């Protein structure tokens, strides 16, 4: 199971596009609320009803954690203590940890990008402590995948999907979705 975290102020395309792609690959993705209720409102006033509250999730079996950006969504993720503990443990155990746009700052501020290649939304580079900054849409380094911003949301989703379904399957999916990388 994959867990995609939503905090108030998240970026819609960075939350919806990757989940859609992963579900098209028959992967189980759950939206997890890092807010006070299951309903979380985005940076652009779209409300999404999550599957689970953060405190309801058993992360022991999680195969991947996904953080969308957006503002103040990424800041709200950074300030969520429970999420910080889960992310650090999960990433250090070598499990898939993904963040896009401003959200890689959550990884960087928690020491999870030290010695890794990563990307983020322009202006957030100072938060990627110890990372080698790579100005690409998507950067993969071991168990960490980072994405640059809203325009990279589909490429980010495909990169995550390929970890589970393989690139052959993902390329066929891209063709069906009229995506030309």
Regions found by a protein language model. Give the residues of each.
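Short N-terminal binding/cap micro-motifs at the start of the first secondary-structure element
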Residues: 10-15, 39
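N-terminal beta-loop-helix "entrance" segment that forms/cooperates
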Residues: 32-53
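Active-site-adjacent pocket-lining segments in enzyme domains
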Residues: 1-4, 10, 24-33, 52-53, ...
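Histidine-anchored nucleotide/phosphate-binding helix
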Residues: 19
């Amino acid at each position: 199971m994959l867990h995609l975290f939503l905090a108030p102020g998240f970026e819609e395309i960075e939350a919806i596009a990757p989940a859609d792609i992963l579900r098209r690959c028959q992967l189980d993705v759950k939206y997890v609320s890092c807010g006070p209720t299951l309903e979380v409102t985005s940076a652009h006033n779209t409300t999404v009803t999550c599957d689970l509250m953060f405190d309801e999730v058993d992360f022991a079996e999680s195969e991947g954690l996904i953080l969308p950006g957006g503002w103040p969504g990424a800041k709200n993720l950074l300030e969520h203590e429970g999420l910080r503990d889960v992310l650090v443990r999960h990433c250090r155990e070598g499990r898939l940890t993904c963040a896009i746009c401003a959200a890689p700052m959550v990884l960087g501020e928690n020491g999870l990008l030290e010695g890794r290649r990563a990307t983020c939304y322009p202006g957030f580079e100072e938060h990627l402590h110890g990372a080698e900054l790579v100005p690409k849409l998507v950067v993969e380094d071991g168990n960490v995948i980072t994405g640059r911003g809203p325009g990279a949301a589909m490429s980010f989703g495909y990169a995550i999907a390929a970890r589970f379904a393989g690139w052959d399957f993902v390329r066929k999916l891209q063709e069906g979705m009229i995506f030309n990388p």
